[in-house]
């Protein structure tokens, strides 16, 4: 019941995905060969959310791995859980997208997409009641961004009523991996606004800061960063996989978090994050988890929630705790920091409690917030985009693959619209009545306000 099909695209997506399957397999007691060596029936009760049961009791991930070059997949295959995946579910090309969104979306990616969709169909058909898809990819490269968004739009056509959740790695503010990141990211966001249901925004720099500042790792590797992402990915779906007192699933999450359809880009966080040596010196309590969870330093994307306001938020607790205490803490957060929550959505934190904590912890919490501060991220990318696009720098790489400049202009204005929508709701108060009419043009000046 309620299966989720997992797709990882491009180098970044495959590396995050590989880490994610290590975390999930560990939680469910599945070893690298797919055999079950767990210690509790609860691990098996709803293992089919993420796994197919094959012959001989092997558990095989419902995962589809795609890339336009074989390199990363070979390293996934050689990694600790490489043998657990179904060999037919590796779909790769030989050419690479060369950090070019157009190659991933229109030329190279378009050639490979049908074979990916065949695998998606096969996985979806083996589901009892498919809940939705989760996609791990980055927005700065070529494959994850270009081909990833192509796949999302194709799946959207074929499964319009299924949830589409993405874990999208945005370009970092100070660290740039490729020069054309702003182009690729803007073109991708243009797609995600229209076709995804929930986008969890991640960025490497914020992850580095967490590793460095909170976990006290002197030289964080991508493996460390990806581990952070994967515990959040696991936390988001723990309610589907383990029994809980207050459940949530992808659809409940969306209904509670998305007040306006376009504003579905979320900040994510996790608690407790402690350095390896200091764990035994603190007892975990719900208040402590709540405090750390809402801490700006804990956000996995480089935007500071203190610069905006929360439209909505969701807190998913794991472990044995009283729901009363959870409710009290949530109320407490909203009362103490009321200026950081919009007042026109009362009680805007959804909480859920799942009984089984992650391995090695007594309790943990996953945080998902819909904050207007996320506009900082889009603004930053948009500024870099405009700087290059004004001079038409690097554009020939894209037009050479058959793209039109028009598409860039559209993507740019779509992203700027998104920023101003966030800003509009950040400034809004409960009193302005005429403001939120469907026709955004009528900004409340035309019709007389009836107070």
UniProtKB/Swiss-Prot annotation:
Biological classification of the source: Eukaryota, Discoba, Heterolobosea, Tetramitia, Eutetramitia
Single Gene Ontology MF annotation: metal ion binding
Location(s) in or outside the cell: Cytoplasm, Cytoskeleton
Function of the molecule: Tubulin is the major constituent of microtubules, a cylinder consisting of laterally associated linear protofilaments composed of alpha- and beta-tubulin heterodimers. Microtubules grow by the addition of GTP-tubulin dimers to the microtubule end, where a stabilizing cap forms. Below the cap, tubulin dimers are in GDP-bound state, owing to GTPase activity of alpha-tubulin.
Cleavable signal peptide: none
One example of a Gene Ontology biological process annotation: microtubule-based process
The family this protein is said to belong to: Belongs to the tubulin family.
A Pfam family reported for this protein in Swiss-Prot or TrEMBL: Tubulin_C
Chief localization: cytoplasm
Quaternary structure and interacting proteins, as annotated: Dimer of alpha and beta chains. A typical microtubule is a hollow water-filled tube with an outer diameter of 25 nm and an inner diameter of 15 nM. Alpha-beta heterodimers associate head-to-tail to form protofilaments running lengthwise along the microtubule wall with the beta-tubulin subunit facing the microtubule plus end conferring a structural polarity. Microtubules usually have 13 protofilaments but different protofilament numbers can be found in some organisms and specialized cells.
Binding site for Mg(2+): 69
Record-given protein name: Tubulin beta chain
Keyword Nucleotide-binding: yes
Binding site for GTP: 11, 69, 138, 142-144, 204, 226
Cofactor: Mg(2+)
Region Disordered, annotated ranges: 426-451
Ranges of biased composition (kind: Acidic residues): 429-451
Keywords: Cytoplasm, Cytoskeleton, GTP-binding, Magnesium, Metal-binding, Microtubule, Nucleotide-binding
UniProt GO cellular component terms: cytoplasm; microtubule
